[in-house]
């Protein structure tokens, strides 16, 4: 019988509608059945250097980093019986194998930032474990890390723990393919309107309000008993603003299944230039939903065939099928740029995040500064905004400058078929 460590997620509802997810590291057998729960989760601290954390903090990816390290030292390369037996060589070997993508049964390519996140998580985890088991551990804290003083993103001098040994990474980074010409965007969104209107608002929320795909899955209908997820501001009979509620991750399904994480809890608005396009999409979608069921007691905006709120995983799989349908459409086009993009899609994978990238490129070309991009994208860090602004010159060469007149892509066929957009 072989075993491995895995992450188990338990979800419950508190305060009547808010979702609370807790992760545990469990031991599973070769059939995937849980044999035992461990207490390793108690050594996994929040990524924020704070004495307290939000009750909704689920640990993000930290549990997965730790589970991978535990499998490495208990089963894959070394065969220790207790974590007290871990040595600094084992830790160093794991982090370097992880950084160079040569772990057993794991050849994933990783970015430098992902490797850094893993290193920090493992150091914090072992630091906490050693502190509580110092009389039993073979490894000492001074062997594990040293404390240095660095300047953070805001220019403030802070202390940070870094490994006391060298960690390398391969640098063989696979570039993420996210570019999408406006012509292709028009074709794609019209294809969604005609063939897949069930995910139209997920596309619109990312393209016109900058929401992350998983965040878009959290948006509720205007009549949701949990509170309106969308509010339309109307002045003199005209919609002048659309406000989106992302303040809390709520339970939107009768089976308690989370639909996706909200990375930054906030109130978000549709970008003004895209207001008309967003409203057109909304009208088309709501006309479509008149003939489809949904769980009214939760009021999720986007639902699956069973009427339950769509999850990010379900959205991702559906999007991949749409891309497969899109490729022959692009290849049959008479425009050389569109045909070329079709060939690129045959060689590169894209995900629903491409709509948020399209949104970010448009805002950069519209002249938004760092603060503006951070606000409209819902970012905590300025790094992404700075990257877009640093590449603005190249973006201006690559894309034509577009104004609000771009958004006449709502074809009359779609308006007739679904009764929206007028």
Question: Language-model segments: what does each one mean?
Answer:
Residues 219-281:
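Conserved tyrosine-mediated DNA breakage-rejoining catalytic core shared by Y-recombinases
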Residues 263-318:
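Major-groove DNA-contacting interfaces characterized by cationic-aromatic clusters
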Residues 135-184:
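Flexible interdomain linker/hinge and immediately adjacent N-terminus
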Residues 404-422:
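C-terminal secondary-structure termini that scaffold catalytic or DNA-interacting sites
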Residues 377-403:
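Catalytic-site neighborhood detector that most strongly recognizes the C-terminal catalytic loop/helix
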Residues 317-375:
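Short, basic (Lys/Arg/His-rich) helix/loop patches that form interaction surfaces
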Residues 182-213:
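Basic, Lys/Arg- and aromatic-enriched nucleic-acid-binding interface segment
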Residues 1-131, 422:
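Charge-rich, intrinsically disordered N-terminal extensions
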């Amino acid at each position: 019988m072989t075993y491995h460590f895995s992450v188990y997620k338990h979800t419950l509802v508190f305060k009547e509608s808010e979702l609370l997810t807790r992760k545990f590291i469990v031991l599973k057998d070769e059939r995937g059945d849980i044999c035992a729960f461990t207490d390793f989760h108690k050594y996994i601290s929040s990524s924020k250097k704070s004495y307290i954390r939000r009750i909704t903090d689920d640990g993000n990816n930290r549990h997965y980093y730790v589970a991978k390290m535990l499998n490495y030292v208990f089963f894959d390369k070394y065969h220790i019986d207790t974590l007290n037996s871990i040595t600094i060589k084992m830790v160093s070997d794991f982090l370097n194998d992880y950084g160079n993508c040569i772990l057993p049964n794991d050849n994933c390519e990783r970015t430098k930032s992902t490797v850094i996140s893993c290193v920090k998580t493992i150091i914090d985890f072992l630091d906490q474990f050693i502190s509580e088991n110092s009389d039993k551990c073979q490894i000492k804290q001074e062997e594990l890390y040293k404390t240095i003083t660095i300047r953070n993103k805001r220019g403030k001098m802070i202390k940070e723990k870094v490994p006391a040994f060298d960690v390398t990474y391969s640098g063989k980074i696979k570039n993420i393919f996210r570019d999408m010409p406006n012509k292709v965007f028009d074709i794609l969104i019209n294809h969604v309107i005609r063939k897949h209107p069930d995910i139209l608002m997920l596309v619109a929320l990312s393209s016109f309000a900058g929401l992350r795909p998983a965040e878009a899955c959290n948006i509720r209908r205007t009549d949701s008993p949990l509170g309106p997820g969308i509010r339309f501001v109307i002045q003199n009979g005209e919609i002048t603003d659309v406000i989106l509620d992302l303040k809390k991750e709520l339970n939107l399904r009768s089976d308690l299944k989370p639909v996706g994480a909200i990375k930054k809890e906030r109130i978000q608005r549709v970008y003004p230039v895209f207001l008309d396009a967003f409203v057109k999409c909304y009208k088309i979608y709501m006309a479509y939903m008149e003939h489809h069921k949904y769980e009214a007691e939760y009021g999720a905006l986007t639902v699956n065939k069973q009427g339950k709120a769509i999850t990010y995983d379900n959205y991702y799989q559906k999007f991949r099928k749409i891309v497969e349908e899109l490729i022959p459409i692009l290849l049959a086009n008479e425009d050389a740029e569109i045909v070329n993009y079709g060939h690129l899609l045959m060689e590169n994978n894209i995900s629903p995040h491409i709509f948020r990238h399209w949104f970010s490129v448009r805002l950069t070309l519209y002249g938004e500064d760092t603060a503006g991009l951070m606000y409209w994208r819902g970012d905590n860090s300025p790094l992404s905004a700075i990257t877009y602004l640093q590449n603005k010159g190249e973006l201006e060469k690559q894309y034509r400058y577009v104004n609000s007149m771009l958004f006449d892509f709502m074809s009359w066929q779609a308006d007739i078929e679904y009764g929206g957009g007028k």
